Amino acid sequence: MTMATHDKDVTRALQGLEDGSSSVRLRAALTIGTAPDPRCVDKLVERCAIEPDFSVREMLTWALTRHAPDLTLPGLLGEVRSERAQARSQALHTLSKIGDRRAWPAITRELLSDADDEVARSAWRAAVVLVPEEERTELADVLATQLGRGGRETRLSLSRALIALGEVILPTLGAATAKGAPAARQHAIATERLLHDPDAAFEFAIEEAKRVVALGTPGQEGQ
């Protein structure tokens, strides 16, 4: 392929990212990811913030992972501070896929407790990928402040994030079980049960946790 032909392909793909058809945008992102070019990075990041189609957003993220982190991190780290929730969420999602721990300082307490559930969930997933070993316990303590939040999907996402940290979460879950609000206690108990039995259904763990909370703290049942 000549340089002139490649330049035309890049121009066509960049234009395709703004096409009214999601299938055209999907192909454009695939093309860029297949033949990475630094000139496309800014447009990929920009498009992530506004792309309405989930499949296209996933392809945009994939295309970004195909470029060198030195090229993608600056733009993505800027997006996590955006006022647009989708920009924050998709940037965090992409950072979790890239897995470069230089991004860790950008995962702030504010993002981990973001008012938007999608942003918070993306932040939780990114955090457990990027966190240094020596900060895992502190991260568990911050994540525990979100126990009991939201509906099923949000709670399951938080449980999975906590479980990904391993047994360092046990003291944190114990504290939440002992002193948390009822919803947080239920969520903490269910998360610990899933940690010990990964094959257990989340709904079953929650129902069991509700029963435990209703009867009293673990160890008090039947007294």
Spans of features found by a protein language model:
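Ankyrin-repeat and related helical/solenoid repeat scaffolds used for protein-protein interactions
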Residues: 137-187
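Alpha-solenoid HEAT/Armadillo-like helical repeat scaffolds in large eukaryotic proteins
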Residues: 12-16, 43-51, 75-83, 106-114, ...
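Structural detector for internal amphipathic alpha-helices that build alpha-solenoid repeat scaffolds
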Residues: 1-6, 12-15, 22-37, 46-47, ...
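Eukaryotic acidic, Ser/Thr-rich intrinsically disordered low-complexity regions
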Residues: 174-223
